[in-house]
Amino acid sequence: VEEVQTIRGGLKGLVVGKVLTCEVHPDSDHMHVTTVDLGDGNEPTQIVCGAHNVAAGQKVIVATLGTKLYDGDKEFVIKKSKLRGVESYGMICAEDEIGVGNGHDGIMVLPEDTPVGMPAATYFNLESDWLIEVDITPNRADACSHWGVARDLYAYLVRNGIKTTLHRPDDKAFAVDNHELPVAVEIERPEACLRYCAVTLKGCEIKESPKWLQEKLITIGLRPINNIVDITNYVMMAYGQPLHCFDADMIAGGKIVVKTLPEGSSFVTLDGEKRELSDRDLLICNAEEPMCIAGVLGGKGSGTYDTTRDVLFESAYFHPTWVRKSARRHGLSTDASFRFERGVDPDGQLYALKQAALLAKELAGGEIAMEIVDVQSPELKKSFDVELEYQYVHELIGKEIPHDLIRTILTALDMQIVSENEKGLSLRVPAYRVDVQ
């Protein structure tokens, strides 16, 4: 555990202020010089603001001096500054600057009856929570999720004699509602895509996620987008399996093809960049064109938008080497590629897909419109056996460990004891433990 803190930033240092005056900046055609009452009994605070919609009389959210604001993994501190020769002692904030929404078309303007001086955490009804930041070593891909960390915590508690249960929500509620939107899957490069699962939902309403889901994502440094995209991020962080969602109307020919394209082909990604492809870039395509660089980043136009009604969820196992090389080739690093590069659980695709579909039914009102397609390569890694000698354990750790304690720890870590003799154990290791050899 690297750090334990309250919910990311906890909106600490952010308060409701009232803009008393608002004048055009003497040396800028787009900035304004404001004075703001922060409700602290002191003189009004001078703040230079670049938002086009700031005006006298507004109730706004103000980041006071010393406040930390976050943008993903980055943080910056509000300091006294001088903008075009005018001193500024704080910042009037937009939604996205404090992590409560996506809006950046001007500052947030609050209702007129909002009390001046009210902490932003109170205004947004921010519930108390704790964020535990865990430093994951590069070889522990299995721990890149809440479920993965929970497995290790469970083993630790069991080893220390604390009665503990490990529970993962079941997926028994998953059921196909109709067969109105079938999509076929074809894998042309099975050495690069060892498993591809997909399911469609019809009649979804794309909208903001409920407050509980937005707050979960904001807490861990992710920005809410819409209910469908947020579901994929939530499931990935919870269980370690990256997902991708497509607008089903964009899947020409009703078919997903996992393949490569000729060297030099072009593709425009979600960030608007036109990229020249290698013939070693694995792509998720429809019957006519590419839609996504597998495991790395989606294509422009193939995602979900306000007008989307039918979606396809993808849950796959892409070979770590292929994803790593594509990500580096294009200078991209995403939460999905981070996990695929290190190796996700080869048995985790169906569970994650079902959880996403169930959440989509709950939050977007869709109906599951096909049987899950699950295409696997014979080379897909399953559980495997290793031999462990007690003497090796003693030498590695530097002291002798009782055999019964070794067995307890290994069993708690989901290692199955196949056989045992006086020298050691034969173990069956779950496929998700890519660090075990």
Question: Predicted regions: what is each one?
Answer:
Residues 1-177, 312, 328-331, 335, ...:
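Phosphate-backbone binding interfaces of nucleic-acid-interacting proteins
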Residues 2, 18-46, 117, 214-215, ...:
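Conserved mixed alpha/beta core segments that line enzyme active sites in large multi-domain catalysts
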Residues 6, 24, 165-265:
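Glycine/proline-enriched, intrinsically flexible loops and inter-domain linkers
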Residues 7-12, 79, 168-181, 231-239, ...:
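A glycine-rich phosphate-binding loop feature that marks nucleotide/adenosyl-phosphate handling sites
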Residues 10, 377-437:
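Noncatalytic alpha-helical scaffolds and linker/capping helices
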Residues 51-62, 138-157, 221-246, 288-308, ...:
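Conserved phosphate/anionic-ligand binding catalytic regions in large, soluble enzymes, centered on
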Residues 96-97, 102-105, 112-114, 170, ...:
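Conserved catalytic alpha/beta cores of large enzymes that bind or transform nucleotide phosphates
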Residues 153-188, 363-392, 400, 436:
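Terminal amphipathic helices with adjacent charged low-complexity linkers/tails
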